[in-house]
């Protein structure tokens, strides 16, 4: 029974995401934050494309004091969404290699990098590199700390 339920769920998810990409390019509504680069709208998880935020258990160091910068990045994304009354508007771009929906969410992707709480994910896109350079120069967010790039941290600790 569990196997049948899993198969049916997979088929429905596959159909639903195919329909989203075929018919709709945007999804908007009340958003909840999963982590520093993932939100959920209408039950759909959307990975913010072109950026990479610290992992939820990732530590960074400010003045030699460790803090959970993954949690800080998540809280910053929550703050950005609250400015828009808890809503987000995202354009679907693609699926990543794990099957997650990648989206460019109006004002969110760029703000996370510009405010220094995510890095430009240059492995996939240089779109946010300009904003990263500015944040780094101004020592905003992560750039005021000692940190591993999230991709490096995942290689070391996951």
Task: Describe the role of every protein-language-model region.
Residues 5-6, 10-11, 16-158:
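Small beta-barrel nucleic-acid-binding modules, primarily SNase/OB-fold domains
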């Amino acid at each position: 029974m569990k196997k049948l339920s899993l198969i049916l769920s997979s088929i429905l998810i596959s159909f639903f995401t195919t329909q989203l990409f075929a018919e709709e390019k945007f999804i908007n509504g009340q958003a909840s934050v999963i982590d520093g680069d993932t939100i959920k709208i209408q039950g759909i998880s959307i990975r913010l494309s072109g950026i990479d935020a610290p992992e939820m258990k990732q530590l960074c160091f400010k003045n030699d004091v460790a803090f959970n910068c993954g949690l800080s990045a998540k809280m910053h994304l929550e703050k950005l969404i609250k400015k828009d009354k808890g809503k987000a508007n995202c354009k679907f771009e693609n699926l990543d290699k794990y099957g997650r929906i990648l989206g460019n969410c109006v004002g969110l992707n760029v703000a996370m990098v510009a405010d220094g709480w995510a890095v430009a994910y240059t492995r996939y896109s240089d779109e946010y590199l300009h904003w990263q350079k500015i944040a780094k120069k101004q020592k905003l967010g992560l750039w005021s700390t000692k940190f591993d790039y999230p991709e490096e941290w995942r290689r070391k600790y996951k």
